[in-house]
Amino acid sequence: MMNVPEGFQPLFRSSPLLDLLGPFFCRQDAQRQLVVALRIDEKHCNHGGTAHGGLLSTLADVGLGYAMAFSREPPQPMVTVGLRLDFCGVARVGDWLEVHTRVDKLGQRMAFASARLHSGERLVASASGVFHLP
């Protein structure tokens, strides 16, 4: 049985890729911004025993993309046109990894968001994304 921190619920949407990597969880923070999270498992790790950069990129893209899509009423799907990820630390098996998102700007066709990936107080990565409303 996986230990999930209080306040987190299963992620409200999924996909074949997320089903392979998950389970993913989410909640809103005190500023009503989306937080997406998962518990790091061996399947998420590289040969060095830490969470793979591709997983961190996927987690950032999921968190930022969902935050952007659900920042509009009604929610609207958006397409990632740019994603930047800066690695600042590592996540290990058993770590609870959270992506704290922030919507920076919503335009008519383009939107911008940023995120910080944390394991507890430890910063693992920072990310920014640009999204297009098709």
UniProtKB/Swiss-Prot annotation:
Superkingdom of this protein's organism: Bacteria
InterPro entries per UniProt: ACOT13, HotDog_dom_sf, Thioestr_dom
Top class in the EC scheme: hydrolase
CDD domains the record matches: PaaI_thioesterase (cd03443)
Keyword field contains Hydrolase: yes
EC number: 3.1.2.-
Presence of the UniProt keyword Hydrolase in the record: yes
GO molecular function ontology, one term from the record: fatty acyl-CoA hydrolase activity
Gene3D superfamilies per record: Hotdog Thioesterase
Pfam families: 4HBT
UniProt entry keywords in alphabetical sequence: Hydrolase
Similarity comment: Belongs to the thioesterase PaaI family.
Protein name per the record: Putative esterase PA0474
Organism: Pseudomonas aeruginosa (strain ATCC 15692 / DSM 22644 / CIP 104116 / JCM 14847 / LMG 12228 / 1C / PRS 101 / PAO1)
Record lineage: Bacteria, Pseudomonadati, Pseudomonadota, Gammaproteobacteria, Pseudomonadales
